[in-house]
Structure formats: structure tokens, C-alpha cells
Amino acid sequence: MLEPESRNSPLEEKIEGYDSAGNGQAGYPLDSLFIRQETRSVSEILKRVKKNRWILDPDFQRAFVWPKDKQSRLIESCIMRIPLPVFYVAERESGEIVIVDGLQRITTFLRYVDNKFRILGTSFREEGNQNNPIEGKFFHELPVKLQERILDTQLIMYILDANAPERARLDIFERVNSGVALTRQQMRNAIYNGPATRWLGEIVESELFRAATGRSLRPETMRDREAVNRFCAFSILGVEKYRGDMDEFLADALRYMNNHGNDLDAIRGKFEKSLRSNQNLFGKHAFRKSLAADGSDASRGILNISLFDVCTVILAKFPEEIELESPSGRKIHKELVNLIERNDEFIHAISFFTNNTKAVKTRFALAEGAFGVRG
């Protein structure tokens, strides 16, 4: 019998100044959510997946590691007509369907129907026949009636409407996901897969980004992509547009980037210039409160994502890369140390309830004032 998909929570790296997205002030009315139930056959879903109408996160597909015995048991369950757990999917505004809970199962169906693996370790027997007709068989080697039984298997889908509030969408998928536990950025990567998510992937794989962040953000959890997503949101949409809902804010940035692919090279240039400036000014203490410790030999602290927001976004506004030896470089270094060390309002804004609208606007306003930059 098919076992439930395992839920292995990824190890979380230590990050300061990071609120779980969705801790903003604004709530959402439950009666605004629209979830409908539909039943589709395996055959119908696979056709739509191959036509890119139903979307599988390509990053997940590349990392697909479901054990072969679990893949075989899924196919065996279909042949034995054992009901499968429901699937949760999200509808895009453009009409495509993004599979969020059930990726392992759909990927397994795709792989088996495409003859990518043999069924192994099964105990299926047909009535009156002691031989196992499916053991060791590729899909094309099965009797036609068993091929049809797999393709005709009915799957229950709960479809979340495209107009549901962003935080509600992620909250629901976080609650219902029965497979490998996904971070909210991994869910965004699936829902908004396109030029924006591919661009984020390219940025975080660069040596410049890895060096500037001290390799502190785990690619497995996509915390690295989330950090860049935050830079893009505050840079493109502006701090003044932030209303306390980080999920919606980050999603808005991804929507913009998907629709304005020609802007991505310019955004990359500003971001990379900012990373180099942060490296020049703060070295191994970039984006860390340990910058305020005396001496260059002080231990490196934990990366603070709120400092990352402030320092990358503000330094990206300077026309040129900033060197520590320059007058502006010395001023910025001194002022940031003072903010981290002596300004209680700034310290609170990068440490507690950091998704709160007031905290976000406070830390940006104080840093912009100290660095001599207009908002």
C-alpha cells in the first residue's frame, strides 16, 4: 500500500532580523478565499503538464529524489485502484495551474509513463494468477488494460483561485503540503516560475553573491533567492509601497519582473554594484551586527536579513561602486557602526517584528539619513 509522502523539514540556517513572512499587520477575510474541487484523470493531467498548462517547478524536478520503492508503490496503488491523497494546486492569473502539493506524485507519473523506471518490489497479483504481471516492467511492457488503468486513475484536485490573497495562498499550501516541507520562497518559485525566478537562480549562483553573503544563505531552502527577491521588491516597488505584508510584496516584485524582463539586466547591474560596495566597506561583517565589534579580527556574526535589505538597496542608489578609502565610504562605515551600536530605534527595527510596516520604514529612513541618501 502507498505510504504518505515524507515530510522532512529542511534544516534552517540561522538568520537574524527575519520574520516569518505573513507576520504583517494586515489580515485576510476567510470568506474571500475561493477553493474549488475538481477530479481529473492521470492522462488528462499529464497532457496538460506536457503542454505547460499545468506547471511543475523545474527546480523541484531537477532535485527529484523520491525513492524508487515509493515510486513503484504509487504506480501499484493505481493498478490496485487504491484511492490517492488529494492534490492542492494554484491557479495563475493567466490560467495555468501550478502544482504545489503532489509534485512527487505527478513527477512519478510522468517518469513512469515516459518509461524512465521499472516497477520493483511490488506484491500485486491478478485473481487466478500467481504471477506478478507488473514486477520489473516499464510502462510500455505492461498489458494494455493495466496501462489504461493507470492513465484512467481519477485524482482529486483542490484548486486555489488566482484572486485569493497571496498570504492566504501560501498559508494554505504551508498547512496542506504533505511532501517535502517547502519554504515560502520555494512556493513562490513554483507559483511565479518564469524569467524572474530563473534570474534569481542565476544571481545567487554567482561567486560575487556567495562571497558577499559569506555563503550564509542555504540554496536548498531558497533563502538566498528570497534575499535577492527582497532587494528587488524594495528597489523596484519602493519602500513607500510596503504595507506590512511581505508575502504580497515579494510576489508583486516577481510579477513585475516576469512582465518586464528587459529591466532585469539593469537591476542586476545595480545589485552587483551594491554587493561590491558592501564588500569593500564592511568585509566579512557585511549585513551583520558584528560590524560594530572592535577590531577587524572580531568573529563574524549571523547574517541579518533586515541589514541586507537596507545596505543593498541604499548602496545601489549610489552612481558608482564605493571604496572604504573614499570620503563617502568612511562616512557610511562610521554611520552604520553608530546605528548598530547606539541607535536603539534602528536596533529594534532590524531585530524585532521586522516585517512590520513601521519597522521597515524606520530602518530605511534612519539609514538613508545617516548615509546622506534621499529616499
Stretches found by the model and what they are:
Residues 228, 232-375:
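C-terminal subdomains that position terminal phosphate/3'-OH groups for nucleotidyl transfer/ligation
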Residues 51-58:
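A short, surface-exposed helix-loop junction/capping segment
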Residues 45-49:
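Flexible hinge/switch segments at interdomain interfaces of large molecular machines
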Residues 2-44, 58-255, 334-337, 341-357:
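Basic- and aromatic-enriched surface patches that contact anionic nucleotides/nucleic acids
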